[in-house]
Amino acid sequence: MEAVAVAAAVGVLLLAGAGGAAGDEAREAAAVRALVARLLGPGPAADFSVSVERALAAKPGLDTYSLGGGGAARVRVRGSTGVAAAAGLHRYLRDFCGCHVAWSGSQLRLPRPLPAVPGELTEATPNRYRYYQNVCTQSYSFVWWDWARWEREIDWMALNGINLALAWSGQEAIWQRVYLALGLTQAEINEFFTGPAFLAWGRMGNLHTWDGPLPPSWHIKQLYLQHRVLDQMRSFGMTPVLPAFAGHVPEAVTRVFPQVNVTKMGSWGHFNCSYSCSFLLAPEDPIFPIIGSLFLRELIKEFGTDHIYGADTFNEMQPPSSEPSYLAAATTAVYEAMTAVDTEAVWLLQGWLFQHQPQFWGPAQIRAVLGAVPRGRLLVLDLFAESQPVYTRTASFQGQPFIWCMLHNFGGNHGLFGALEAVNGGPEAARLFPNSTMVGTGMAPEGISQNEVVYSLMAELGWRKDPVPDLAAWVTSFAARRYGVSHPDAGAAWRLLLRSVYNCSGEACRGHNRSPLVRRPSLQMNTSIWYNRSDVFEAWRLLLTSAPSLATSPAFRYDLLDLTRQAVQELVSLYYEEARSAYLSKELASLLRAGGVLAYELLPALDEVLASDSRFLLGSWLEQARAAAVSEAEADFYEQNSRYQLTLWGPEGNILDYANKQLAGLVANYYTPRWRLFLEALVDSVAQGIPFQQHQFDKNVFQLEQAFVLSKQRYPSQPRGDTVDLAKKIFLKYYPRWVAGSW
């Protein structure tokens, strides 16, 4: 591939979402000033001046910020866009003031006077885009959010330099208008949509119907929310990505148009065709462009556009044909439905399909898709590039621009995990790849509010031209900023975590918590890990040692709880291994001892310490869902949606425990009863001399799991107990056993 062709493709894309007029500069500057006031308060905000100047960018499309002043003068923050100015503000707060902004909270103690910036500090991003989100994030993390929570997230996005992000709320209301216009009945539409917690997979054609329908109030509230989200994103100069038609239609379309050419796709995620097996329009069917253009026209009429659209036709679904001609036609149909309405359309495609089913997506099939859209009009997300990059085996996506993304988290699971070395070096390697068409970096987790160190690093890399030279020094500074003070034991704890849980490498690294703690028990559970458990326990000890100095820091208390949770997760694996070994050896006394500690001491202790922090409460999680409702019946429905997603995921445990969380209440009333039932079954097996029957246990435990989902029990949404005291209590009981190797 010639470098000229690559440059031309990237050049076309750089036109998308390019900076606007002087009026936009003023609006973006005002948005950043408002952010400063929200973040720091009106008093400290007066010490900052903010301006947006397009001419500041050294090259078109490359965001640039400049910092100056401070000391006796106001701090000057200038940016080529609002996002650039916000990123510059964050740089000043982070590197000059030692502040920290994160999902779990912020540490914003400003030095007085404000530190002066030596001379003028100017920084330009090496790439056009810093992308954020995954289609699944909309369901695993955002689904129940109100405007206040969205406003905080958009502030976080701006501070971290995000300038390209999905904005997919409210689309079902638009689809409802389109389907009604096509002749579907309201009942048919209601039957098609999933419940709120599963909309991400309805939007990608994986599911329909499951745990629906959507109440009318849902559409109204989501439309309102989408308008506010879009207004706020655009006020910073971000480019929102709107949805487009990917080809999936309700079955009822075949009633209205009996001659329509559709293919019934295969099942997905162990669901049967009552909830899966979507209908995909043939690309040559004349109704394809009609539906696609109807939807996009109505969407743009409602929300406006920034000309980048997301659509995923074959997400985790095998296409009806592997013939390159079919795949090219299917791709062309989606793209032409966009350009029929918006001649400037750029298609944002999640590259997950190429990674997820490599046995289907051979070179010819990949070329067919990538070559069916003009170069520069398809923007591919290399979604899991930190672990399994696709650009390296597709010649940089055959010349189409791509964004190097860190996926990191699956299902919104809790669990300390990261591949920081791979993340640190990945973007530079992609930029230096022969004839690279990389145009950005991205964060694409399925769920957020976990492992914040990973996202701090990735956000920083979006503005760096090279990797962080010393990750150990970087993580030590991260801890000092996070807690507001440097502490040797806390820094040492973080360096141990860096070399252990945050040092996963190789293709086996998937950010999915498969710990026995959060899985349906069996005798075949995998307890293998990529790190030395000693590092986790020693980091735990060091963090507790620093508690007398750091316990007033909310971030420290959060991290201490999270590390205690991780230590208990390790202990559960160890006691499980002992119980399994005792069962296989038919040693009843050892089985009773190990199983008793696991199910009757360790798990209750975990639930108790989790209950000390509102961010680890099932009650808080479910209250979000209930608060989105306008009636008690709706609140019950939304809560059940949320319970299903956390546990069974489908009516029969179809994707069981995929979205597992470690929350107080969930541990006590879901994970603990499962473990007790399992261990009691093992004890009965040994005592009576009969084999343990996994299939019978699965039937029995499903009754417990389903009962939890259908339960109306309410859980506290306010924390109780002191995190430090409870963590110390667990530590003093189990750490000596770990050191002695006595279980």
From Swiss-Prot:
Main location: other
BP terms from Gene Ontology: adult behavior; amyloid precursor protein metabolic process; aorta morphogenesis; astrocyte activation; autophagy; cardiac muscle cell development; cell surface receptor signaling pathway via STAT; cellular response to oxidative stress
Consequence when changing S534Y: In MPS3B; no enzyme activity; synthesizes a polypeptide with a molecular size similar to that of the wild-type
Molecular function GO labels: alpha-N-acetylglucosaminidase activity
Pathological association: Mucopolysaccharidosis 3B: A form of mucopolysaccharidosis type 3, an autosomal recessive lysosomal storage disease due to impaired degradation of heparan sulfate. MPS3 is characterized by severe central nervous system degeneration, but only mild somatic disease. Onset of clinical features usually occurs between 2 and 6 years; severe neurologic degeneration occurs in most patients between 6 and 10 years of age, and death occurs typically during the second or third decade of life.
Recorded consequence of changing R643C: In MPS3B; accounts for approximately 20% of MPS3B alleles in a Dutch patient group
UniProt name for this protein: Alpha-N-acetylglucosaminidase
Record keywords: Charcot-Marie-Tooth disease, Disease variant, Glycoprotein, Glycosidase, Hydrolase, Lysosome, Mucopolysaccharidosis, Neurodegeneration, Neuropathy, Signal
SUPFAM superfamilies assigned: (Trans)glycosidases (SSF51445)
Similarity comment text for this entry: Belongs to the glycosyl hydrolase 89 family.
The EC number(s) this enzyme carries: 3.2.1.50
A GO cellular-component term linked to this record: lysosome
Keyword Electron transport belongs to the record: no
Effect on the protein of changing A246P: In MPS3B; produces 12.7% residual enzyme activity
Signal peptide boundaries: 1-23
Subunit annotation: Monomer and homodimer.
Effect of I154R: In MPS3B; does not yield active enzyme
Enzyme class at the top of the EC tree: hydrolase
Compartments, record wording: Lysosome
Catalytic reaction equation(s): Hydrolysis of terminal non-reducing N-acetyl-D-glucosamine residues in N-acetyl-alpha-D-glucosaminides
Effect seen on changing Y335C: In MPS3B; decreases the enzyme activity markedly
InterPro entries per the UniProt record, alphabetical: Glycoside_hydrolase_SF (IPR017853), Hex-like_dom2 (IPR029018), NAGLU (IPR007781), NAGLU_C (IPR024732), NAGLU_N (IPR024240), NAGLU_tim-barrel (IPR024733)
Consequence of substituting L35F: In MPS3B; no enzyme activity; synthesizes a polypeptide with a molecular size similar to that of the wild-type
Its job: Involved in the degradation of heparan sulfate.
Organism: Homo sapiens (Human)
Impact after mutating Y309C: In MPS3B; does not yield active enzyme
